[in-house]
């Protein structure tokens, strides 16, 4: 599981305090510690002691499918993160990357144990007018200019998913599909500006499901059972009602993914009751997602069959590398990188090491930059190995994401604009060379910015005939 974070910036004075004598010491004794230098301290390239070279990469497409979307793992309880939003929707017309289908599981609880409806006294009558499941809308990604509506269905979850275990993007809910609880159709082209009226008050855009009457009857029965019912305590309630499963209808042919803050899910019960003084009154009770007891997780399924990307992804990597690379926000496709030239590279001080990747846009005359929300605004880089163990390159924790870069940038050459992603990984390359690490791999993919599955980029691969292939540029000083 990978989650992107901005790390603390290193104190700049500790870098600029590096003196020439320290550099010379490392040159004479070998280099196994951090030797990243600011630009004004990088030695002049004299081709006697200090050189610069550009090295070819070997790049392949791989699947990155291990995003933690619910529960807890290694102390990180993602279900309790207030800024981790869940994807909901379908993309069915992406000819390059294929189809995406996103759904989620969410649980709610009464505000208190031994919940009771607001009645003046025992024996007064009560009528539930409606129960609404409300989930705030945050944003959307995809082709929001497409005027195609999407329908979402609500079902009852029939399996317990513990908040103390881990759920991933590939975790699928178990639901009672024979009994539809609610259905709602939305158009993401206008949804972001829709402000529903609740009474006389305008609300922020939200997904609102009016739940079936059979759910109202069932809930009311459990409450009226008192100590013997599900509303007596939180454990009983979650045993009785394990959660809601919200998913796109099978008939959807959308082109947009919506993002919802189901951390703020509300179940609102609107009802009337008779007062002891006569007449009726109206009121409401609210059940909510409670991070101390409830769980939530996001299921995101990618289907590449029939897409262009499917031609570049397989169980066996192309030994010559792929000519095109596909990078999605996790879960999805990522690019694996090997650098053959580093094998048996002479021991040196690496003064600068920078990877460069160039985007292809549009791809195959298909306007991916317009139709699907633009290229990844930022890619992230990880160090992995032959076993698939992923770690962020240490430059993130030492210097911060701004130093590593990976941001989308544009430059012009001969009147043509190009989009590139660059990564500064000097210390990582230094250790690979110093330790003669023959198992290392690097991996680039979209950053996880709280919007799982968003954004995509098509990049030139190492086997491309174009001269804008990915490359490693190094400035290094040989150790005599």
Feature map (PLM): residue ranges:
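Secreted, disulfide-rich extracellular signaling modules
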Residues: 2-480
